[in-house]
Amino acid sequence: TRCVPDRRTRIRSGTGRNIVDKDDKSDIVMQLIDEKNLTTVENICQYDPVRPSIPCEWRIANGNKVFFKGVKSFDMRYVTEMSAACCVSFKNTVPKSEMEMVSSVHSGNIAIFYTVWSTRKGAGREIIFNIVDYLKEHKPNVKRYVTLSPKTEMAKKFHLRNGAKLIAENETTYNFEYFV
């Protein structure tokens, strides 16, 4: 069995309004960013250590999503106190490489977690499981939750420790699946 992260953190979607969960004493909210908030995506993705080469525009095009856990600035354009971020694409097949993923424009029922990073211990795990919960509720057509992870020992340990199963070892990537 896996430990379930604190369910008090909720994902907020929409225009990027900073809506804080009243139970969360840290004033940090997890939020979905849509295509109207390119400035926010640019602000977040400039720190992406996993896949910095993926353009910000692609990350929110064709149904792709960017989630973050942090606080937005007063003018709603910048993120402060960010503890985690995760980018998700929806595909019909599991990609074996970054190039394969970005060259496909088809949307599907497999959620591909292609980048996740955090600045606080445990925040990466929290954001993954919070996103899975969000997708189960808001995108019930999603049937699988799979990663496109760099082929590193750190990524391997992270996903295995969090209950994922290694389903493919590719030339430059791993695919892990979360059976939740």
What are these regions (language model features)?
Residues 21-65:
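Short amphipathic alpha-helix that is part of the acyltransferase structural core
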Residues 85-112:
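Conserved acyl-donor/pantetheine-binding loop and adjacent beta-alpha core of acyl/acetyltransferases
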Residues 160-170:
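Conserved acetyl-CoA-binding loop of GNAT-fold acetyltransferases
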Residues 121-136:
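Conserved acetyl-CoA-binding loop-helix of GNAT-fold acetyltransferases
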Residues 111-123:
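A short, internal acetyl-CoA/4′-phosphopantetheine-binding micro-motif in the GNAT/acyltransferase core
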Residues 60-84, 89-92:
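A short helix-loop-beta-strand connector motif used in the catalytic cores of GNAT acetyltransferases and
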Residues 172-180:
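C-terminal "cap" of GNAT-fold acetyltransferases
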Residues 118, 145-157:
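Conserved beta-strand-loop-alpha-helix junction that forms the acyl-donor binding cleft
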